Structure formats: C-alpha cells, structure tokens
C-alpha cells in the first residue's frame, strides 16, 4: 500500500491510497460469490447461479460495497503512514478501479491545527469585583414587596407609584410599527420602564381619559430602526390604581418559604451571592478567554464549526420547547450560530492544548467539589446530583472538562497582567 498526502488550503488535506488491483478484484469476487450462494434466479437452482450472471445484475452495488470495505480496512493504516489525524470522518472524493495494475481512492478531510500557545505573561486581563451592599439587599427585598403589592382602582388623578392600565398606539409619520400597539398594558409610574417622557406624560391623568404624547426615541434605543425617530402615542387611560404594599412581617416571610423576616433577609443575601458569583464567574471567564483567543490566531476546522453550530441550534430549539414556546416561523439556519460556534471550537482547542502542555487532570475530589457547587447553586440534593453524574460517563466527562477549564483559567491568571474593576451589583445583574 502506498499513501500520499496533499496539503491543500488551510487545514484541508487530500489523501490518496494506491493498492494492487488484485485486492479490489478479490474483494468483488468474494462478495459476488456470497451473493451467488444466496439469491434465487429463474432457471437456476439456489446456490448455483453463475458469478457472471450475478455480476451483470449486481455489479454496481458490488463494486460500491467492495470499495467501502477496502477503505474501512486500509484507511487507518494509511493515515498513520502519512501521520495525519482527521478532525472528522474523511469523505471519499475519487475512486479509480479501471487501471490494470492499481486500485486507488482519494479521501478529503480537515486536520487539527498545530497550536503553539502564546506566553501568558503577555496577556492583559481585566477582572470584575462586586460587593453586595445593604442598599442592594434592600432593593431585592423591595422587589419581593412589589410581587405581593395589590392595587385598588381609584377615581382620582394619577400619581407617582400608581399603576395604570392603558391602551396605546404609536405612530411614526402617521404609520404604526412593530410593537407600537398594546391593550390593557400595565405600567407603574416612576419605574422608568418606558422611553423618556412616556411615564411623565401619564401623571395627573384620570380614568377613561385620552391623551396624545409627542416623544422621541433615544439615539441608543435597542431597536436601531426606531433610534432618534419622532413618535406620537395615542393613549386611552382605562384605570388608575392605588398600590397597597404588604407589611414586612412573619406572614410576608412565609410566603417566600422562610419562618420570619430575619431568615428571609439571610436567604436573600445568600441568593444574591449565588447570583452574583455566577455572573462574575461568567464575565471574568469570558474576559480571560477573549484575551487568550485574541493572542492566539490559527485556522479553526470548518467541520467542527459546522457540528457545533448544529448543536447550538438544537439547544436553542430545546430551550424554546422547555419554556413552552412555539416553533419559529421558518427554519433558522445553523449558519446563524457560526460566530459563536467558531469561538467555542477555538477555545476548546486552546484549552485542550494548554491542558496537554501542562499535564492537567481533574482529581475525583475536584470533580465532587464541582458537583456540590452545581447542586448548591440549583438548590438540589447534592448526593443525588453526584450519583446521577457518576452513573453517566458523558455527564461525568462534562464536569471533568469544567474542572480542567477552571484550572486553565487559574494558570493564565497566575501569569498574566491582571487588573481589577469594582462594579455595582446593579451593573452586572
């Protein structure tokens, strides 16, 4: 067997394997003889059908089967011979079985990039720090109060703190636009949930009244097509309702599963810490890996990007179904996820290379600690979580990879130039 590797553009490779034609002929003869011993043909006893007759009837299928068997039997050795490791299953691109002396096939594939990781000491990374203040805790408690706040309709003019029920329609140049209309829309005055001027225009209005507001969308509005546009809102006031806040007592605390207010405040603080730790961890990890990715430029296998994009599309569809959502109108192409897929694949290759270079491995103790961290964050039974992962090799591997990923982060932070930026709880939640 002779194997020759052609280096194409980027990570693309083409491998041609040459074999004696006798190997192909012997393989086809063997398959033909097997078929001849099994098939029934008119005019012939079973098992007595001439091979020539079988070849005429099944020749193309036999050749295809023979080629597949030869490729399966020889490809691994051929790849070893040329020292190539495909990223995914090689694809047959050419077959030559007509030559009198040789049979050859060509497969195309991508290889993994050769990665020489950049010096960590050259990286500059910003990490976020957040301190939870008493004011943050009070805001969270106020949010719980709002959940249990009741509203009673009144016949007076509206004030800050009142909840209004309105119908509205927005017009730009006399025409409506997406999201411009709503019926029985609830808005609490003073929350700042609408564009500037909207809530202000609803102060001192009475039930069953109508008004028009001429406003301008902010230049940094999240919908670009509306940014900076002048808009007229036609508004009907259906109801003005006075808030009745709940008392902060034992009854209030029990509605949130705690015995009293002291226990509720402790629970709030713990939940805020879990939330902020998760958010900071996510942002700081991204900052580390963004710096790592920027410092290491190399080709990323397109086949891996395509596979990851398909995975991301599948995850999105599953999330929509789990949340009770309806399928999107029209199929979303996997290519819509290419940028994120490329990022994930590249970082996966970098983490793997760093792990290999530094001989990193996750101990059982580290894996169990990570499982406990996950179970505590989700408020679930720790032992059940650990048992479920230990019984599923795929799940256990995912935890092992998370542990190694964290080890890589720590390794980078230990050597990089790291700066810290203090932020407020509200800024990152």
UniProtKB/Swiss-Prot annotation:
GO terms (BP aspect): 'de novo' cotranslational protein folding; cell division; chaperone-mediated protein folding; protein transport; protein unfolding
Keyword annotations of the record: Cell cycle, Cell division, Chaperone, Cytoplasm, Isomerase, Rotamase
GO molecular function: peptidyl-prolyl cis-trans isomerase activity; protein folding chaperone; ribosome binding
Cell location: Cytoplasm
Ranges of residues in domain PPIase FKBP-type: 161-246
Coiled coil: none
Reactions listed under catalytic activity: [protein]-peptidylproline (omega=180) = [protein]-peptidylproline (omega=0)
Main enzyme class: isomerase
SUPFAM superfamilies linked: FKBP-like, Triger factor/SurA peptide-binding domain-like, Trigger factor ribosome-binding domain
Record-linked InterPro entries: PPIase_dom_sf (IPR046357), PPIase_FKBP_dom (IPR001179), Trig_fac (IPR005215), Trigger_fac_C (IPR008880), Trigger_fac_C_sf (IPR037041), Trigger_fac_ribosome-bd_bac (IPR008881), Trigger_fac_ribosome-bd_sf (IPR036611), Trigger_fact/SurA_dom_sf (IPR027304)
Record GO cellular component, one term: cytoplasm
EC annotation from Swiss-Prot or TrEMBL: 5.2.1.8
Domain notes: Consists of 3 domains; the N-terminus binds the ribosome, the middle domain has PPIase activity, while the C-terminus has intrinsic chaperone activity on its own.
Record-stated family: Belongs to the FKBP-type PPIase family. Tig subfamily.
Function: Involved in protein export. Acts as a chaperone by maintaining the newly synthesized protein in an open conformation. Functions as a peptidyl-prolyl cis-trans isomerase.
NCBIfam families named among the record's database cross-references: tig
Protein name: Trigger factor
Species in which this protein is naturally found: Ruthia magnifica subsp. Calyptogena magnifica
Phylogenetic placement of the source organism: Bacteria, Pseudomonadati, Pseudomonadota, Gammaproteobacteria, Candidatus Pseudothioglobaceae
Gene responsible for this protein: tig
């Amino acid at each position: 067997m002779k194997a020759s590797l052609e280096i194409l553009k980027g990570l693309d490779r083409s491998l041609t394997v040459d074999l004696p034609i006798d190997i192909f002929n012997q393989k086809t003869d063997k398959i033909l003889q097997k078929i001849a011993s099994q098939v029934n043909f008119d005019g012939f006893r079973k098992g007595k059908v001439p091979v020539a007759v079988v070849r005429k009837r099944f020749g193309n299928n036999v050749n295809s089967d023979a080629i597949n068997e030869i490729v399966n039997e020889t490809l691994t050795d051929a790849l070893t011979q040329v020292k190539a490791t495909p990223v995914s299953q090689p694809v047959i691109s050419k077959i030559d079985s007509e030559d009198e002396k040789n049979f050859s096939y060509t497969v195309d594939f991508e290889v993994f990039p050769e990665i020489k990781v950049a010096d960590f000491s050259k990286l500059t990374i910003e990490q976020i720090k957040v301190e939870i203040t008493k004011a943050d805790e009070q805001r969270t408690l106020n949010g719980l109060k709002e959940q249990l706040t009741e509203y009673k309709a009144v016949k007076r003019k509206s004030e800050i703190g009142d909840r209004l029920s309105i119908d509205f329609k927005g017009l730009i140049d006399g025409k409506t636009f997406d999201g411009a209309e709503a019926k029985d829309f609830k808005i609490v005055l003073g929350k700042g949930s609408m564009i500037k001027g909207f809530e202000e225009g609803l102060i001192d209005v009475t039930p069953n009244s109508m008004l028009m507001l001429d406003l301008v969308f902010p230049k940094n509005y999240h919908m670009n097509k509306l940014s900076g546009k002048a808009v007229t809102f036609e508004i009907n006031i259906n109801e003005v309702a006075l808030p009745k806040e709940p008392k902060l007592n034992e009854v209030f605390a029990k509605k949130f599963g705690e015995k009293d207010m002291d226990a509720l405040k402790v629970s709030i603080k713990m939940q805020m810490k879990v939330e902020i730790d998760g958010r900071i961890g996510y942002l700081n990890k991204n900052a580390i890996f963004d710096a790592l990715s920027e410092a290491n430029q190399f080709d990323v296998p397109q086949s891996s990007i395509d596979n990851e994009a398909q995975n991301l599309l599948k995850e999105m569809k599953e999330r929509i179904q789990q949340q009770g959502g309806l399928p999107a109108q029209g199929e979303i192409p996997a290519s819509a996820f290419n940028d994120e897929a490329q990022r994930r694949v590249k970082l996966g290759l970098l983490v793997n290379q760093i792990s290999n270079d530094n001989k990193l491995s996750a101990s059982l103790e580290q894996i169990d600690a990570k499982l406990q961290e996950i179970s505590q964050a989700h408020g679930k039974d720790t032992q059940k979580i650990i048992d479920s992962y230990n019984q599923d090799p795929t799940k256990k591997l995912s935890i092992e990879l998370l542990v190694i990923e964290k080890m890589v982060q720590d390794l980078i932070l230990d050597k990089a130039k790291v700066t810290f930026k203090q932020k407020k709880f509200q800024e990152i939640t």
